[in-house]
């Protein structure tokens, strides 16, 4: 059955295939346009450089009027990412707009990696470290990057 949400997701997928933003990829799981797997590559010249981070995106029939549920499957250490992989990002909550597509969502998450908001922490330890001990924070991020190479 082709619903407005499914049509929009097909359009998002085609756009992502034909004009993929640098450092991100995503596709629906087999036979389920409402559930996507995605990968964000750590941006160059940052502590995240070289990392390969997996995410899942769960869309509802209310998409694009409501945002998907997005979470990292990969283990993360970041001020705005909860232990369960959920992401504290305004466009996934109160700043959502139907103009955002999958590419915009993933690009925003990639930007968040390098530009966290320690004033809205999902991980208080990472937020404190980011603000008070950047060297140790970067070391912990590098550990997560190395783990991303071997994680399933």
UniProtKB/Swiss-Prot annotation:
Q: What is the main EC category here?
A: transferase
Provide this UniProt record's keywords sorted from A to Z. ATP-binding, Nucleotide-binding, Transferase, Ubl conjugation pathway
Which Gene3D superfamilies does the record associate with it? Ubiquitin Conjugating Enzyme
Transferase is among the record's keywords: yes
The pathway entry for this protein reads as: Protein modification; protein ubiquitination
UniProt record, GO biological process: protein ubiquitination
Name of the featured protein: Ubiquitin-conjugating enzyme E2 2
Q: Which organism is it from?
A: Medicago sativa (Alfalfa)
């Amino acid at each position: 059955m082709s619903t407005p949400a499914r049509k929009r997701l097909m359009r998002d997928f085609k756009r992502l295939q034909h004009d993929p933003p640098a450092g991100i990829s995503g596709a629906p799981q087999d036979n389920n346009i409402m559930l996507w797997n995605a990968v964000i590559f750590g941006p160059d010249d940052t502590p995240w450089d070289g990392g390969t981070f997996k995410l899942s995106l769960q869309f509802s029939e209310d998409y694009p009027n409501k945002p998907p549920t997005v979470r990292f499957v990969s283990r993360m250490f970041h001020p705005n990412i909860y232990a369960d992989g959920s992401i504290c990002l305004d466009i996934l909550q109160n700043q959502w707009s139907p103009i955002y597509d999958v590419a915009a969502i993933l690009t925003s998450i990639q930007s968040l990696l390098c530009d966290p908001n320690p004033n809205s922490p999902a991980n208080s330890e990472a937020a404190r470290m980011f603000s008070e001990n950047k060297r140790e924070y970067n070391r912990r991020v590098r550990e997560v990057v190395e783990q991303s190479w071997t994680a399933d």
